[in-house]
């Protein structure tokens, strides 16, 4: 099962929405690949450094999600993720 970063707001999760917006991770690291990839250092239950595949943002059915987080990103890391998503989607801030 591929690890993912949930980027959807808590309100939709709490409302029982049937899908969740995610960014998949890969351990196939690629240097200098921003903005399409962002590096996440190994921590908690995420055993290896991984790249977030920003260009593969998508919604998945909640039944595909496993309970419990492998790791949590800091506020600064999440802001970098959201900035990069906005850049890739050409959304003005």
Cite the ranges covered by each PLM segment.
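Compact nucleic-acid interaction/catalytic patches
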Residues: 1-42
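C-terminal terminal-subdomain/extension
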Residues: 42-93
């Amino acid at each position: 099962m591929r690890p993912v970063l949930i980027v959807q707001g808590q309100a939709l999760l709490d409302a029982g929405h049937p899908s969740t917006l995610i960014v998949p991770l890969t351990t196939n690291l690629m240097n200098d690949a921003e903005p399409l990839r962002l590096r996440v250092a190994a921590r908690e239950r995420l055993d290896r450094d991984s790249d977030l595949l920003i260009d593969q943002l998508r919604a998945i059915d909640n039944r595909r999600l496993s309970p419990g987080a492998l790791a949590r990103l800091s506020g600064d890391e999440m802001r970098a993720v959201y900035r990069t998503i906005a850049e890739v989607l050409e959304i003005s801030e």
